[in-house]
Amino acid sequence: MLDNKIHYRTCNLCEAMCGLEITYKEKKVISIVGDKKDPLSKGFICPKSLALKDLYEDPDRLKTPIKRTENGWQEISWTEAFDEVEIQIKKIQEKYGNNAVATYQGNPNVHNVGSMLYGGPFLKSLKTKQKYSATSADQLPHHIASLKMFGHQMLIPIPDIERTDYLLILGANPGASNGSLLTAPGFPQKIKSIQKRGGKVINIDPRFTETSKISSQHLYINPGKDALFLLSLLHVIFDQGIEEKTHLSNYLKGLEEIKEIVKEYSPKKTALLIGIDSLEIQKIAKDFMNSKTAVCYGRMGVSTQEYGGICQWLINVLNIVTNNMDKVGGAMFTKPAIDLVYMTGIQGKVGNFDRYRSRVHNLPEYSGELPVATLADEILTEGDGQIKMFICTAGNPVLSAPNGKKMEKALEKLDFMVSIDIYLNETSKYANIILPTTNGLETLHYDLVFHQLAIRNTAKLSEILFEKDENQKHDWQILNELTERITGKKNPLTPEMMLDNMFKFSSYKAANLSVKKLKENPSGIDLGALQPLLTKRIFTQDKKINI
């Protein structure tokens, strides 16, 4: 016991950013418990955090490059692996064009600071339009709504659940997930806190979920009818009359058009299709607009459906017209220590939509990516621009993308495939070469993305707990090497150096944030509750919110 040491870090296995207190001895984890000093999670953890120990100790985890041969998988050196990947990229692009090489980024990329900092330059170096990620099978409607309404793809409203009086949840199960595009560790307890202070939590879902069990009320809705439900709520609200002058009134564009659109969606007309009684719809609308503070939140169930984009747009409209947008207890916006929205926004890098289309199905791009639903057909369909090589980073699209069987057939047809992954799985088994990264406890970690989506502004750096084996490589080292092989240029900065440079642009000047200071405060630094700031963050050309 005397030799045991304590390490503090953030769990990076989901979006909740739970703080961990890890007891260890030498290179063995003794226990993992919640860090009560973490300003965001305050001691809460879920069972997933224990998997960090399992991942570190897993004998099946790859640590050295492997190559598929006629005699099975064989270990090879990093030099041989990089040489082969470089040769194949250059050969295939020279023969078939840049777009013959496709990439896919799985969700773990945004949970790893190395991938976030070095992945972009690698993708750019390939000069291909055939880029894909989990985004189009997940949260794309959120980004499109934010881009079109507020002018920036990452300006995503965050429900202020710790100060709201009324929480309306559609197609989300934060009781199990602890929030998605809403980083809120300990979400079930926060639901109970709303109720304890006299508030209500209404859950609209075709299923009775973990969230339904602890909500004030659960109502079943017919699948895919969420847009009708939201239009009907707005019909009632406009019929009742909204407060014409709010702090956002001078920034709104399109309010009269919205009023006209929703006139046709009376609950009496739509209730049967929605599957919720018209009186219930009216009551929810009136309660929402009459609550001191209220916020509507919708996630996967309203995003991954035919009307996903419409749903996320209408959720924003509902929060805006009831004077609950950019307001304490409503939908708010973060100001993280490393403020990606501000840093990219002032450079005009706010996101893009429909600049070009996919080759086979004529589907629009989003910020340089095409929908993953068309990836298999882009490989299988012959002709100019056909994908011949595929680079998959921390993803398993055979399981996670639409039509996994077709994806398998497509991967079998490739001339060459590379997986950057720690496991031999349903997708990586089709690769010619697998480049494994370090993982979890072997890595430096700072959440660049999820601080942008959290219910409180905090900053926390997790140092490496266990040094990697001599033959292992971090994700940033792999991506940096591949970029150099293609461009001849190598980024000389380490992740710590890059983070320090980014902290120099932090708006929290008084906090004097740096990698060194965060290392001195391993449980994290509290930067305060969310504050109204949208009017200073609108990136549309006319500085209006296009509702």
Can you annotate each of these PLM segments?
Residues 96-100, 243-248, 295, 326-333, ...:
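Flexible, glycine/charged-enriched surface loops at secondary-structure junctions
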Residues 116-192, 199-204, 228-231, 319-430, ...:
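Extended redox/cofactor-interaction regions of prokaryotic respiratory oxidoreductases
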Residues 441-468, 478, 483, 487-488:
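Glycine/threonine-rich phosphate-binding loop and adjacent beta-strand/alpha-helix elements that clamp
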Residues 69-74, 240-278, 465-534:
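N-terminal leader/propeptide and maturation segments of large enzyme subunits in energy/redox metabolism
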Residues 104-111, 272-276, 299-306, 338, ...:
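Conserved short loop/turn motifs at secondary-structure junctions
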Residues 172-173, 214-215, 265-268, 297-302, ...:
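Flexible glycine/proline-enriched surface loops and loop-helix/loop-strand junctions
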Residues 1-240, 254, 269, 277, ...:
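N-terminal export/assembly segments and adjacent metallocofactor-ligating motifs
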Residues 84, 88-92, 121-125, 194-197, ...:
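Generic, well-ordered alpha-helical scaffold segments in large soluble proteins
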